[in-house]
Regions:
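ACP-dependent fatty acid/polyketide chain-elongation machinery
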Residues: 1-67, 245-257, 352-367, 410-412
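Flexible, low-complexity linker/loop segments at domain and module junctions
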Residues: 1-8, 95-98, 291-297, 328, ...
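Condensing-enzyme catalytic core mediating Claisen C-C bond formation in acyl metabolism
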Residues: 5-9, 36, 214-291, 300
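Conserved beta-ketoacyl condensing-enzyme motif
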Residues: 8, 24-25, 29-162, 191-202, ...
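Short beta-strand-to-turn element immediately C-terminal to the catalytic PLP-Schiff-base lysine
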Residues: 16, 239-243, 289, 320, ...
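Active-site-adjacent elements of ketosynthase-type condensing enzymes
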Residues: 43, 47-53, 110-114, 193-220, ...
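Active-site-proximal alpha-helical scaffold in enzymes
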Residues: 78-91, 140-144, 148-151, 156-192, ...
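Glycine-/small-residue-rich "gating" segment that lines the acyl/pantetheine channel
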Residues: 124-131, 169-172, 176, 180, ...
Length: 412
């Protein structure tokens, strides 16, 4: 059976830099930081007191208030981004095509704020105060479940959980379902909402977060010599994927093609990347092989780029090992410098941004590179966006447990 082509026909996002594609992309290209002091809880006693918060989001624009009360915030974000993507795609689910449409939207952690609130209720008021909606309000596959119900989707309905690679893996696996003939259209991506006491406190305890409380907007500084950890973010990025001939037949707008998908495992450490970048190298090369693309065809790479001392260096080394001399010709960018790290939502949001980079032929900047680390010696599109030719782009995501993913996007 010949391999079916997969294209992107709809985009949606909720993010620290905007709550729709137009606003988010505009702020990203302008280099505006979405990192602010935490307002969702009193962070006075925490070592990190800032995050990439979603601002101005009205859940009732997407979900009736009565229903929204029975969902954790990550579900709100995922549903909203999914609804945006479906509207953008112009695709209609009908009784005739419903079994050929699927959804795979995941989360790295899921309903942590709901778990915190419910635990407090349990301790203070006893087990009878636990909401009957607690479990479906918290579990990770409920974004996919709600989108399936809302649109009448009767094909594959699942969610993946692979830490910070979740959103990318969801998109990659959704693309393969289309390639292999299991679906014609898929909604795919990731969402997260862990700007909460346990979310901030847990990563702070692991010494993973920046502590630059005096200037949150400059705290996320990938590849800068003075980077001191990542900044937690929240939101969602979701896209509609479609079989190419199916999209053409209905006259759909096509943003880009998903040409390749690769995965690898570090087999090294619970939280630290391989210092020689080998997991990243193998992952990128697997994606390029899957796409049938040579290394010298790649011009843009949206990196994992978390602003951690170990991670940024390991990814740089991995890129150089994968691309050889061509690595210096690639524009590498980290949009986390503006959004923070959305954990399981990051691969979804950043894949949306990568598709927009291909579609608009622009690399967003990596802001906050004030003193570039000499050991990180690639072109990181420092501080200003750049118009450029992008025929082939890569997107990397890496997660705790040594789980890696890379997507290859091509201009159509």
């Amino acid at each position: 059976m010949s391999r079916r082509r997969v294209v992107v026909t709809g985009l949606g996002l909720i993010s620290p830099v905007g709550n729709n594609v137009a606003d988010g992309w505009a702020d990203l290209v302008a280099g505006k930081s979405g990192i602010v002091n935490i307002t969702k809880f009193d962070a006075t006693n925490f070592s990190t007191r800032f995050a990439g918060e979603v601002k101005g989001f009205n859940v009732e624009d997407y979900i009736p208030a009565k229903e929204a009360r029975h969902m954790d915030t990550f579900i709100h974000y995922g549903i909203a981004a999914g609804m945006q993507a479906m509207q953008d795609s112009g695709f209609q689910v009908t009784d005739e095509n419903a079994e050929r449409v699927g959804v795979v939207v995941g989360s790295g952690i899921g309903g942590l704020p709901m778990i915190e609130v419910t635990q407090t209720e349990l301790l203070n008021r006893g087990p009878r105060r636990i909401s009957p909606f607690f479990v479906p309000a918290s579990i990770i596959n409920m974004i996919s479940g709600h989108l399936s119900i809302k649109f009448g989707i009767k094909g594959p309905n699942l969610a993946l959980v692979t830490a910070c690679t979740t959103g990318l893996h969801c998109i990659g696996e959704a693309a393969r379902l289309i390639e292999y003939g299991d679906a014609d259209v898929m909604i795919a991506g990731g969402a997260e909402a862990t700007v909460s006491p346990l979310g901030i406190g847990g990563f702070a305890a692991a010494r993973a977060l920046s502590q630059r409380n005096d200037d949150p907007a400059t705290a996320s500084r990938p590849w800068d010599k003075d980077r001191d950890g990542f900044v937690l973010g929240e939101g969602a990025g979701v896209m509609v994927l479609e079989e190419y001939e199916h999209a053409k037949a209905r006259g759909a707008k096509i943003y880009a093609e998903i040409a390749g998908y690769g995965m690898s495992g570090d087999a090294h450490h619970m939280t630290a990347p391989l210092e020689d970048g080998d997991g990243a190298r193998r992952c990128m090369l697997a994606a390029l092989r899957n796409a049938g693309v040579n290394v010298d065809q790649v011009s843009y790479l949206n990196a994992h780029g978390t602003s951690t001392p170990l991670g940024d260096l390991a990814e740089t080394i991995g890129i150089k090992r994968a691309f050889g001399d061509h690595a210096k010709q690639i524009v590498v960018n980290s949009t986390k410098s503006m959004t923070g790290h959305l954990l399981g939502g990051s691969g979804g949001l950043e894949s949306v941004f990568t598709v927009l980079a291909v579609h608009n032929q622009v690399s967003p900047p990596t802001i906050n590179i004030f003193n570039q680390d000499p050991a990180c010696d690639l072109d990181y599109c420092a501080n200003e966006a750049r118009e450029m030719k992008i025929d082939v782009a890569l997107k990397n995501s890496f997660g705790f447990g040594g789980t890696n993913g890379t997507l290859v996007f091509k201009r159509v």
